[in-house]
Amino acid sequence: MRPLILLFLCQIFLLSCTDPKGPSVDDIAGQYVRLVLEIGQYDSDFVDAYYGPEEWKPTGTKGENLPAEDFLARGSSLLSQCHEVDTSGFTRLDHARLIMLQKQLIAVNTKVEMMGGKVYTFDDEAKLLYDAEPPHYSDVHFDSLLSNLDGVLPGEGDLSVRYNAFINQFIIPVEKLDTVFKVAITEARRRTNRHIKLPENEDFVLEYVTDKSWSGYNYYQGKSRSLIQINTDLPIFIQRAIDLACHEGYPGHHVFNVLLERTLVDSLGWKEFSVYPLFSPQSLIAEGSANYGIDVAFPGDERIKFEKEVLFPLAGLDVSGADKYYQVMGLMENLNYAGNEAARMYLNGEISREEAAGWLEKYQLSAPERALQRTRFMDQYRSYVINYNLGKDIVAHYVEFQGGTQDNPGKRWKIFKELLSYPRTAESLVADSVE
C-alpha cells in the first residue's frame, strides 16, 4: 500500500509542476528570434533587419555545413508549441500575433528546406513563404495590353524600341540625382507626417551604390533609423524619385519598421518583430504597403502636379512631353504581372535566362540590360517578385474595402497606419476584404 501512496503523491507533484496553460507566446517568440538569427549565418539575404537584444545574436563560429535537420526540428517544435498555447482570454490582437508567428515559422522552415536543396514550384513557394496565391496570366492577355500602347507611343516599328526611345527623354541626369531624390524625400516625409506622427529622432542615411540586382533597398537599423541605398547601375527615370522616396522611406519601409518597433516591440514587448526574415509573409505586407503608400501620399493628380512643377525643373527635363509620359506610364502599369509570369516560367525550369529576359523585353518593353538585371533579381529572390504587385493589389483592396478610398483621404491614412502597426498576413487581409 505504501508504494502506491508514494506513486500517487509523485503524480500529484508532477501535475502541480506542469504549466496547465501550455507554452507562452513570449517564450516561443524568443526561441524563434534566436533560430532566425542562426539561420541567417548561412544566407546573407535571410535576415533583413534585427534590433533586438544583443545577447540573442549567435556567438562563436558557424558550422561549415548548413545544419538543416537541426533547424527544421527546432522550427517544427516551435510550430507545435504554437498549437499548444492556451488561447482562452486572447484578444483579437493576441490571436493575430499567434497566427502571424505560425505563418512566419512555416516560411522559415520552407526557406531552410530550400537552402538544403529542396525545390518547390513557383506557386507552392509563394504560398509557403508569403501566404499568397499568385494569379496566372497568358501571353494573350499581355498582347492585348500592348496593343493599347501601340496607339499611344510616337513613331512606327518595333514597340520596345519606340518605348525606350520615348522614355529616355525622362532620365534624371546623374549629377542631379541627389538633389531630385532629396526634394522628393522631403515632400514624401512632409505629407506622411501630417497623418502619421513620427518620432522626433527618426531619420535615414541615403547612399548611392552599384552592382545590385535591385533598384532600392531599406536596411532598418532600429531606434527609428534606416540606411537607404539607391542603385545607379542603370539610368533612373523621373517618376522613380517619388516611387523610391515613398517606397523605401515615407510612408513605405522606413515608416513601416518605425511603427512596428514603436507599437509591437517597444510598447507590447513582442520581440519576434525585432527580427525580420526577408523570405516570409511579412514581406508581402511590407512591399505591398510600400507600393500602395505611393498612391496614399501622392493621390491622383497630386503626384503629377508635384513632379511637373518641382522635380522636372530640378532635373532639367522638358515638361512639355510630361502628359504623354504619364499616359504611357499608366498603360505600362497594366503590364506589371508580366514579370511574375517570366519569373514563374524561369524558376520552374520551363524557359532559360535568355528566354526570360526576352519575355521581359517583349511584354514589359524592358531594354536588354534592364531585362537581364531583372533575371538576376529572380535568381537571388525568386518568388519574392509577387510581393510588389500582388502585395500592392491585396493591400489596396483591403484599405479601400474598409472605406479608405481616394475621396476619403483621412480614413485612407487611418486604415493604412493601422495596417502598418499590427500583425497582418495576406490571407487575413483577403479574408477581411470580402462581404
Where are these regions (language model features)?
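N-terminal maturation segment of proteins
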Residues: C17-E435
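Bacterial Sec-dependent N-terminal signal peptides
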Residues: M1-P23
